Amino acid sequence: MAEKKGSSSEKTLYCSFCGKSQHEVKKLIAGPSVFICDECIDLCNEIIRDELPSTEGARDSRGDLPTPSEIKANLDNYVIGQEIAKRTLAVAVYNHYKRLRHKDKAGKDEVELAKSNILLIGPTGSGKTLLAQTLARMLDVPFVMADATTLTEAGYVGEDVENIVQKLLQSCNYEVERAQRGIVYIDEIDKISRKSDNPSITRDVSGEGVQQALLKLIEGTMASVPPQGGRKHPNQDFLQIDTTNILFICGGAFAGLEKVIENRTEASGIGFGAAVKSKKQRSLTEVFTEIEPEDLIKFGLIPELVGRMPVVTALAELSEDALVQILTEPKNALVKQYSKLLAMEGVELEIRPAALKAIARKALARKTGARGLRSILEQSLIGTMFDLPNTSNVEKVVVDESTIEENKAPLLVYREAAKKA
């Protein structure tokens, strides 16, 4: 190490990086035929410190991968019931991200693992969208939800399939590396089924054509996306996104699919000795457990698309008890949400067990699943929530069965009455 001060006979040493002499700096550290001063060392440390957060962030985004049981436990906090669907999803998602890690480390000669996209089948309001949203939030990966009914073939009015990738990029602030490991949920996939088995002279721009366009995206392709969401024009640079590692989850109600399955599984009989079983004896949930790829093809999905979604899971119809649980148990349960809303007015909300069952029965009658719960509860409380801000002495709002069944106003408990009691 060369000190700052030296005799005049000694040769003056200079920093190999900034060129300052040993007399201009505090310390000059010697290496094999090179020197570095203390100022350059400080500058190097600053550069390293600035780069560390982004490196740590990238490491965290691929950090410890939760196990299938941990993924399912997290789904249990938000989604009631649907045990088979949650287990299937947990394993599929775990294997997908495990595959990506293997791909990063694997050599050229190792076994290449194929991607397993997921198809969720279930009636409306059974939790398909919520499952996908909860998964993405837990894994901290970019997530986008697309509606298949708005998609058309490229060149026609409407959204083309590459808009899905553009939305995914927007959701992660145009970080290409993160977007390529994201999750895409395509809802209403059953609405783009082929209109019939017979080819038509008219072009089906929102049916089979969209399925063909989705096929390449789901399988894995290089999608060209305009930077920062601009319109496409010939003289601009495009962002190239590889969709090979994006996990696609498709969902749909597939109304009428149960008839296709029943026609395949139930043998028709004729004559006095034939065993005739009523189709009404089995629930929709039981029928969907016997689903085969050929049923989806008969329904109107093209065989290539069905083949790209090897993980097929059916969600059960929600029972009355399950709907009551949905009202009260999840982290974001509706009863908790409305209790918080009224608590902001200094009022307590009590919904009696009989009222909860009445709400569940009403939702079942509407055939909208869990999606109908909010509108029923909102309808019963709308008048009370309108009057509460102008009323100062209400302590509690009580919703009983008559409030739901007979559209009566909720009971109001006033503070004076509460004190006397």
From Swiss-Prot:
Any GO molecular function: zinc ion binding
InterPro entries: AAA+_ATPase, ATP-dep_Clp_protease_ClpX, ATPase_AAA_core, Clp_ATPase_C, Clp_protease_ATP-bd_su_ClpX, ClpX_bact, P-loop_NTPase, Znf_CppX_C4
Residue ranges annotated for the ClpX-type ZB domain, each copy included: 3-56
Gene Ontology biological process terms from the UniProt entry: cell division; proteolysis involved in protein catabolic process
Residues the record lists as binding ATP: 123-130
CDD domains named among the record's database cross-references: RecA-like_ClpX (cd19497)
Binding site for Zn(2+): 15, 18, 37, 40
CC annotations in GO: HslUV protease complex
Domain of life: Bacteria
SUPFAM superfamilies from the UniProt entry: Glucocorticoid receptor-like (DNA-binding domain), P-loop containing nucleoside triphosphate hydrolases
Alphabetized Pfam families for the sequence: AAA_2, ClpB_D2-small, zf-C4_ClpX
UniProt key word Chaperone: yes
Keyword vocabulary terms for this entry: ATP-binding, Chaperone, Metal-binding, Nucleotide-binding, Zinc
HAMAP family according to UniProt: ClpX
Function: ATP-dependent specificity component of the Clp protease. It directs the protease to specific substrates. Can perform chaperone functions in the absence of ClpP.
Subunit structure: Component of the ClpX-ClpP complex. Forms a hexameric ring that, in the presence of ATP, binds to fourteen ClpP subunits assembled into a disk-like structure with a central cavity, resembling the structure of eukaryotic proteasomes.
Family per record: Belongs to the ClpX chaperone family.
Name of the protein in its database record: ATP-dependent Clp protease ATP-binding subunit ClpX
Organism: Paracidovorax citrulli (strain AAC00-1)
Lineage: Bacteria, Pseudomonadati, Pseudomonadota, Betaproteobacteria, Burkholderiales
